[in-house]
Amino acid sequence: MYNEALFYQSNLIYKEKNMDINFSKEDIAFRDEVRDWLANDYPKHVKEKTDAGITISKEDLIDFHKALSKKGWMGYNWPVEYGGTGWSASKLYIFNKELGLAGCPPILPFGVGMVGPVIYTFGNDEQKERFLPDILNFDTWWCQGYSEPGSGSDLA
């Protein structure tokens, strides 16, 4: 009896705090567009490997990112004025959820998620023109290096 009461109480608390998400018609149409892209334009050789649990190669990862770029979705978290999608939070959620459900490889975060936003926020026009298109086209790879204190090139 005590366990049943706890279960009931915890469900009430959860339900009160659970967010009710109702997608707009525009969001549902976008979800369908993402699903269509996954069915028709997601590189088949990459999908076959990820579906089979086979590690993808660097070339596979490039093909996946290039396909996103061709669709104009590489800048999924960027403002429109810098070549991004300008998507709403619900579209970002749908995009990430559908790619995850399809078993897509992760989008490499360094260029599009870290370096690009710093450049379009703080860079001058020359830097924006030079670097942003290559990030969106996945023509340049970016990374961030770390080292431990006292063992070589300490970043601190």
Describe each model-derived feature in a short phrase.
Residues 7, 23-28:
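Short helix-onset patch at the extreme N-terminus, typifying the N->h transition
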Residues 7-18:
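Short, Lys/Arg-enriched N-terminal segments with co-localized hydrophobic residues
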Residues 19-22, 46-48:
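Short, contiguous pre-domain boundary segments
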Residues 26-37:
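A non-catalytic, amphipathic alpha-helix used as a structural packing/dimerization or gating element
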Residues 36-40, 68-69:
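N-terminal glycine-rich anion-binding loops that anchor highly charged ligand groups
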Residues 44-156:
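Glycine-rich flavin
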